[in-house]
Each structure stands twice: as structure tokens, then as C-alpha cells.
Amino acid sequence: MGTRGLQGLGGRPQGRGCLLLAVAGATSLVTLLLAVPITVLAVLALVPQDQGRRVEKIIGSGAQAQKRLDDSKPSCILPSPSSLSETPDPRLHPQRSNASRNLASTSQGPVAQSSREASAWMTILSPAADSTPDPGVQQLPKGEPETDLNPELPAAHLIGAWMSGQGLSWEASQEEAFLRSGAQFSPTHGLALPQDGVYYLYCHVGYRGRTPPAGRSRARSLTLRSALYRAGGAYGRGSPELLLEGAETVTPVVDPIGYGSLWYTSVGFGGLAQLRSGERVYVNISHPDMVDYRRGKTFFGAVMVG
């Protein structure tokens, strides 16, 4: 007869029950071991996605806040030179101050500080220069433009010329010489001016000579004179009067080589004189044989100035 299996209380066999318990325990253990990693993986898979959404939401809200701050920030635009020259409107300054205070109250941190600095900088540049003249500063009167002399005023310009048998003479129509507005010239009587008035008289006479050759006595000094006289009118024919005079002293140097070389000098002067109609002006020269007759060297004239 075969051997019977173990039996427990009540006569039930114990081998099958133990096997079932062992299988159930192993199944529970395996299920527990698999559930833990799956749960961890599920948590790790869900948590980063959720956190990523939160980061995007935070970044989006920060960008919107920065945009609102940029929109509310005042634009720092340099004023043009024309705006600086205009008179500022006092009603605009309280609005600018209120806007600065509102911006400072709504903004915090470095952005608010930079906004306050920009507002203060704009406030410093805002006052414009007053273009109205200061009553305490004396304004200089504008001078009247200068005008040329009236072309109708009498004037004359005569140039020296050599005349055979007479020596020094004066030309009234050659080169730069002219007579204007009734002025007349006669070689024997001189220059006649038609109107009473103040005249500017001038005279320039060029002189030239030759130094003595070597072996002769030392040359003496020469005093060259030129003068303007007036005659006629209230002074009578025989009573000339000296108006202006110039003089120059020359001491020629002996030429040690041979024949003496040429030397040059000039005597020039000018001034104002009160002349009357009918009076005549003429030139008196001390050394007519030494006069330089080249162009631009010898001349005299008169022009009415008042």
C-alpha cells in the first residue's frame, strides 16, 4: 500500500496549501518589486514636463512685466537746438513731474532707478534759453553804412612832366590825371577850385641824383623841399600863402670805384585846408633839375571833403 501524504488538523493535506502560499508570496514580492520602479519612472516622466510648463509660464509672465515696464518708461530724446531757443511752457513741467512720480511708485529695483535718473536728466535739459534781450544790457546802436564821396564834388589830380624850355610842368589829362566838377588848371596860374569848402591837398615829388666820383671833395648835404601855396581871392595876386610843406635832407656817398651811382628819394605830404572860390593852388620845388619824372613819382591834387 502506498504511503499517504501529511495531513493537518481536520484530515486535510498540508503539501498543496504550502505550495499555494509560496506561490502567492512570490507573486506579491515580484509585483512589489516591479511596481516600485514603474512608479518612480512614471513620477520622473511626469515631473519634468510639469516643471517645464511652470518655467515657461514664469518666463512668459516676466517678459510681459518687462514689456509693460518698457512701455511705461519715458523716451530719452535729446532736445533740438530750436527747442532750446524757445520759451518753455510752465504748464508742461508739473505733468512731467507727476509722470516721473507715478513711474517711480509703480516701478521697483534697478529699472525704477534708471527711469528716475532719465527723468532727472530730461528735467535739467528742459529749460530753454530766453531769446528776449536783457533790459539790463545796453544795446549798441547799429552804425550807418559808409557812403562814397559825392561824385559831383570838385577834385583834381595832376602828374609831373618835363617841358622843354620850362622844366617842371603838370599834366591834367594824361595817364591818371583828371579834373572834375569845375576844377581848372593853368600852367601859369595853377589849380583853381570852383567852390568854397574844406579840401584835402596832397603833394608827392620824387628826386634823384648822382653821387660824386672818387677823388673829388666830399659831397655836401642837400635839403630838398616841396611846398603848396595858395594865391588870389582874398589874398590878392601878390600875396601867396604857404599851406603845406615837406623836406628831406640827402647826403650822397662818394663812389670809391669810379663814376658816381644814382640815388633816389622823395618828399610827400598832405593835409586839410579851407579854400575859397577864386583861390589858386600851385607847387614850389627847391631843386627842379633833380625831379624824377617817371610814372607815379611826382604828382599833386585836391579833393573837396566838406
Swiss-Prot record:
The chain crosses the membrane at residues 28-48. Heterotrimer of either two LTB and one LTA subunits or (less prevalent) two LTA and one LTB subunits. Keywords: Cytokine, Glycoprotein, Membrane, Signal-anchor, Transmembrane, Transmembrane helix. GO terms for molecular function: cytokine activity; tumor necrosis factor receptor binding. CDD domains: TNF. Residues 154-305 form the THD domain. The keyword DNA damage does not apply. Glycans are attached at residues 98, 284. Residues 74-85 have a biased composition (Low complexity). Its main location: membrane. It is found in: Membrane. This is Lymphotoxin-beta. The lineage of its organism: Eukaryota, Metazoa, Chordata, Craniata, Vertebrata.
